[in-house]
């Protein structure tokens, strides 16, 4: 998600490979094709097969400076998490504390997550920033109840013993003033952002904010502010 510690999977199993026909025009690249894995293999493509299709382009949820994004359905979360829990990141040794936080977040997602996720990388307003902003937006079914659930969960979460230092990150409201009225939360360390973005190396620190029917997750506070400020100013890609 744009951080120094981030990585991507260096390889993928053959069952995840796909054969695509591609068509181009001035506005888009269109791909259609087939995968060669059988339906019973645990691949991302098979996990997606169980989801309800998404229609349309989510440009109204993307800042105008977006240079990479993806959007996919999560109407069947069980199949998504069944796939992600078997990836390389899951083979790492995480503490019982982090595993417990993951379980809590899975319960939260199953209760309140909507049916689609959109994530993007986009440019900061500050040209001196070395890294882009990164955000994941998860539609939620009941924003008020979901935020209350999150607050109660955070209140009940014990402090992590021997936790690494929290990276210094600021919401930078001076640069992004229209984000100030939306409360940001720093979450206990967990791997949910890793699971839902495919990034396998992370400091596991995640920041969250509820915004107009969505739960925003980011690896730093400034990304949340930058995203909300762009949405509030209608500085978006649209269709």
Where are the model-predicted features located?
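Single conserved position on a long alpha-helix in the C-terminal lobe of the eukaryotic protein kinase
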Residues: 1, 110-239
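Leucine-rich, highly hydrophobic segment in Treponema pallidum outer-membrane-associated proteins
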Residues: 1-84, 119, 194-210, 219-223
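N-terminal start-of-chain detector that recognizes signal peptides
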Residues: 2-7, 39-45, 90-93, 105-110, ...
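Generic amphipathic alpha-helical segments used as scaffolds and interaction surfaces in large
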Residues: 53, 57, 68, 96, ...
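Glycine-rich loops and low-complexity Gly/Arg-rich segments
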Residues: 56-60, 93-98, 160-164
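Helix-biased "structured C-terminal domain" signature
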Residues: 57, 65, 95-97, 171, ...
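An N-terminal domain-start capping segment
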Residues: 73-103
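Edge strands and adjacent loops of beta-rich recognition modules
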Residues: 95-119
